């Protein structure tokens, strides 16, 4: 079996990962451009960890400016088998107040300015996104949260908006009445690209606010978010430490096939594939392209 390598993408408020033993910076070049930041490698409880701050240190990148393809590509090149996204979000549910960690199981993509696939002209592929989150990772995350006494909600739909502005009241009410659970700005196309790269993916959506739908709460502001972010970031780091301690040391096959998503996805005939695009796909799709 393959050794498990746990990737952590840190969202707003999580720009480093204390507790990494043997921590060192690693710069990996990507044919898809510059990732958000150099990777931080190390171990926690003996488990290989690769950390990437999504917005760079100091929160230099807005959600629309992040090079999601380069981020996923360098994580794949670093050997990551399982990827956890730590992401701030707003809540549409009374039962998911600020401070709650939501283990979402579905996404709705409302972004419109981002490159959302590694594939395209010269090599077309269609991966399934019916079940975008690894149920195995959600089970491990739930167990880790319970062990740390962290309030979690199991399941929910994350709607990803383009940003960087927050929602209008009409938008917020539309999302709430649609039955969505939380709203954020970063998990799409990240989850789609992780699937194309055959990396098992799960999100911990960390609630900071009620967006602007709630009659008893003011419209969300950056100041409000920062106040909750500090507490959420501390809990997230404790969650990662516990997860790493109990995580299997060998990569477990994904029950929904995330780690073999390209087996039936490629549609372009081999003789019609663009050699230049294939070079860029060496890490993401090398398993099937070389086979």
UniProtKB/Swiss-Prot annotation:
<feature type="binding site">
    <location>
        <position position="185"/>
    </location>
    <ligand>
        <name>substrate</name>
    </ligand>
</feature>
<feature type="binding site">
    <location>
        <begin position="87"/>
        <end position="88"/>
    </location>
    <ligand>
        <name>phosphate</name>
    </ligand>
</feature>
<keyword id="KW-0328">Glycosyltransferase</keyword>
<dbReference type="Pfam" id="PF01048">
    <property type="entry name" value="PNP_UDP_1"/>
</dbReference>
<comment type="subunit">
    <text>Homohexamer. Dimer of a homotrimer.</text>
</comment>
<dbReference type="InterPro" id="IPR035994">
    <property type="entry name" value="Nucleoside_phosphorylase_sf"/>
</dbReference>
<dbReference type="GO" id="GO:0017061">
    <property type="term" value="F:S-methyl-5-thioadenosine phosphorylase activity"/>
</dbReference>
<feature type="binding site">
    <location>
        <begin position="209"/>
        <end position="211"/>
    </location>
    <ligand>
        <name>substrate</name>
    </ligand>
</feature>
<dbReference type="GO" id="GO:0005829">
    <property type="term" value="C:cytosol"/>
</dbReference>
<keyword id="KW-0660">Purine salvage</keyword>
<keyword id="KW-0808">Transferase</keyword>
<comment type="pathway">
    <text>Amino-acid biosynthesis; L-methionine biosynthesis via salvage pathway; S-methyl-5-thio-alpha-D-ribose 1-phosphate from S-methyl-5'-thioadenosine (phosphorylase route): step 1/1.</text>
</comment>
<dbReference type="InterPro" id="IPR000845">
    <property type="entry name" value="Nucleoside_phosphorylase_d"/>
</dbReference>
<feature type="site" description="Important for substrate specificity">
    <location>
        <position position="167"/>
    </location>
</feature>
<feature type="binding site">
    <location>
        <position position="186"/>
    </location>
    <ligand>
        <name>phosphate</name>
    </ligand>
</feature>
<dbReference type="GO" id="GO:0006166">
    <property type="term" value="P:purine ribonucleoside salvage"/>
</dbReference>
<feature type="binding site">
    <location>
        <position position="12"/>
    </location>
    <ligand>
        <name>phosphate</name>
    </ligand>
</feature>
<protein>
    <recommendedName>
        <fullName>S-methyl-5'-thioadenosine phosphorylase</fullName>
        <ecNumber>2.4.2.28</ecNumber>
    </recommendedName>
</protein>
<feature type="site" description="Important for substrate specificity">
    <location>
        <position position="222"/>
    </location>
</feature>
<dbReference type="GO" id="GO:0019509">
    <property type="term" value="P:L-methionine salvage from methylthioadenosine"/>
</dbReference>
<feature type="binding site">
    <location>
        <begin position="54"/>
        <end position="55"/>
    </location>
    <ligand>
        <name>phosphate</name>
    </ligand>
</feature>
<dbReference type="InterPro" id="IPR010044">
    <property type="entry name" value="MTAP"/>
</dbReference>
<comment type="similarity">
    <text>Belongs to the PNP/MTAP phosphorylase family. MTAP subfamily.</text>
</comment>
<comment type="function">
    <text>Catalyzes the reversible phosphorylation of S-methyl-5'-thioadenosine (MTA) to adenine and 5-methylthioribose-1-phosphate. Involved in the breakdown of MTA, a major by-product of polyamine biosynthesis. Responsible for the first step in the methionine salvage pathway after MTA has been generated from S-adenosylmethionine. Has broad substrate specificity with 6-aminopurine nucleosides as preferred substrates.</text>
</comment>
């Amino acid at each position: 079996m393959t050794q498990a390598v746990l990737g952590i993408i840190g969202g707003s408020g999580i720009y480093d990962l204390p507790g990494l033993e043997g921590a060192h910076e690693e710069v990996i070049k990507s044919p898809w451009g510059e990732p958000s930041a150099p990777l931080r490698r190390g171990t926690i409880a003996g488990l290989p960890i690769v950390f990437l701050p999504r917005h760079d240190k100091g929160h230099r990148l807005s959600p629309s400016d992040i090079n999601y393809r380069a981020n996923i590509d360098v994580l794949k090149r670093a050997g990551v088998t399982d990827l956890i996204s730590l992401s701030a979000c707003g809540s549409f549910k009374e039962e998911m107040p600020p401070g709650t960690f939501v283990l979402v199981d579905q996404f709705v993509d409302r972004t419109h300015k981002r490159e959302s696939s590694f594939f395209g002209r010269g090599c077309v592929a269609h991966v399934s996104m019916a079940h975008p989150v690894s149920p195995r990772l959600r089970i491990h995350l739930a167990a880790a949260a319970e062990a740390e006494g962290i309030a979690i909600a199991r399941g929910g739909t994350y709607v990803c908006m383009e940003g960087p502005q927050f929602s209008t009241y009409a938008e917020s009410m539309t999302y709430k009445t649609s039955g969505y659970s939380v709203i954020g700005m970063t998990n799409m196309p990240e989850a789609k690209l992780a699937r194309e790269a055959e990396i098992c993916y799960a999100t911990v959506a960390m609630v900071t606010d009620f967006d602007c739908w709630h009659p008893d709460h003011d419209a969300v502001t950056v100041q409000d978010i920062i106040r909750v972010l500090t507490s959420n970031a501390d809990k997230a780091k404790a969650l990662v430490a516990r997860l790493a301690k109990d995580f299997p040391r060998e990569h477990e096959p994904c029950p929904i096939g995330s780690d073999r998503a390209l087996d039936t996805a490629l549609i372009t005939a081999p003789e019609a594939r663009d050699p230049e695009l294939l070079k860029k796909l060496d890490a993401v799709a090398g398993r099937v392209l070389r086979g």
